[in-house]
Amino acid sequence: MKQLRDRMINVRDQFYKSRRQKGFMSFWWSSPTHVVLVLEVAIANASSKSINFETIVKLLPSSMGSRSTIATVLDDFVARGYMSKDIGKDKRKRVYRVCEGSMDLINDWFTKRDFSLKAVS
């Protein structure tokens, strides 16, 4: 149980640290909807795929928020420069991409978390 306790403490501390930071990390962790939206867009980007608003709405459980909530959060990410909204192959649809700097921060977060979880295991 001590090992599980240490892991939970580590995850909690990482979460608090991310929330205290300014910029992308704090905004990313501001709600479960923010976290999941970034992950869905980042997963698509890392897979060299494009993802548009309609696809995102279909992927997210309805408990994550309404269409307007999802649109507002995505627009906030774009307005802050953490994501971009570009024209896709189908000229009628706009696709979302996580900006390179934000993707680097996500990668760093996962790398640090993986390392710290190994340290307590």
Which residues does each predicted region cover?
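A short, conserved structural fragment
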Residues: 78-88
